[in-house]
């Protein structure tokens, strides 16, 4: 008997893997804006009677130290914790109104135009641009939205029934946690970290900076300046330009 012919199965087309896109990750405090976004958040909270005058002056002193001495892990952690605790017991809607006010009254006046231009250049060249900040997620979201950036990765505050508990969800987005956060984002959004850029002023962000193919130091502290020079990274110091402009 003749052999029964077998109908060849149609081969399924091989699904081509989409090429990975690049992104640019920007720290916020002293990189996108001068000073601490959490302090500016606290200032607006004080103006809305969220906390006492005593707490306000503690914030003011912390801001002074931050601007002139740079980040300090212990001081920064204390500042972030205090800022987050201010929202305990308040409605989520109140926080949303507050962060809009923070941007309009304070943050937009303290933006570094040069860094904002860098971020917008990345957008124009087809890259995603993400803010990576220890400030509350809601504040990061507002800054990203107002600047027409892709989005923000920030510290998340727990919500229950429309009320803020003042407790963190996960860890503050600071130091090594920033590296973990951008790696998770890259995996979820099919981004190539090797093709990506990262910008920061602080040596505390070295874990994030060294996770990408194109790290850039912006208004760097002393430790980051030394590291960036040794590694031959681009360095932008907009503080010196501002001081020179003020003298002219």
Predicted regions mapped to residue ranges:
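Small-residue-rich anion-binding loops in enzyme active sites
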Residues: 68-79
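Active-site phosphate-binding/coordination module
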Residues: 48, 92, 155
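Conserved active-site and cofactor/substrate-binding residues in soluble primary-metabolism enzymes
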Residues: 36, 90, 177
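Acidic/polar active-site rim loop that often engages polyanionic ligands
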Residues: 38-41, 61, 78-80, 161-167
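Active-site neighborhood of HAD-like aspartate-dependent phosphohydrolases
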Residues: 13-69
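Metal-dependent phosphoesterase signature
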Residues: 77-113
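C-terminal cap/substrate-recognition subdomain and adjoining C-terminal extension
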Residues: 2-21, 97, 104-248
């Amino acid at each position: 008997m003749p052999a029964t012919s077998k109908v060849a199965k149609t081969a399924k087309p091989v699904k081509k893997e989409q090429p990975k896109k690049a992104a640019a990750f920007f720290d916020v405090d002293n990189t996108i804006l001068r000073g601490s976004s959490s302090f500016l958040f606290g200032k607006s909270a004080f103006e809305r009677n969220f906390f006492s005058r005593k707490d306000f002056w503690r914030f003011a002193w912390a801001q002074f130290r931050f601007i002139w001495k740079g980040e300090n892990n212990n001081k920064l952690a204390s500042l972030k914790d205090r800022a987050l605790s201010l929202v305990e017991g308040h409605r989520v809607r109140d926080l949303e109104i507050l962060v809009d006010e923070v941007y309009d009254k304070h943050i937009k006046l303290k933006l570094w135009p040069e860094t904002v231009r860098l971020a917008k250049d990345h957008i124009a060249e087809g890259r995603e641009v993400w803010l990576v900040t220890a400030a509350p997620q809601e504040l990061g979201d507002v800054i990203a939205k107002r600047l027409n950036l892709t989005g923000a990765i920030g510290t998340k505050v727990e919500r229950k029934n429309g009320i803020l508990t003042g407790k963190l969800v996960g860890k503050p987005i600071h130091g090594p946690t920033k590296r973990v956060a951008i790696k998770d984002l890259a995996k979820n959004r099919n981004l190539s970290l090797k093709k990506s850029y990262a910008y920061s002023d602080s040596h505390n962000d070295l874990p994030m900076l060294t996770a990408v193919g194109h790290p850039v130091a912006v208004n760097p502290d002393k430790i980051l300046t030394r590291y960036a020079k040794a590694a031959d990274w681009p360095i932008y110091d907009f503080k010196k330009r501002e001081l020179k402009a003020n003298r002219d």
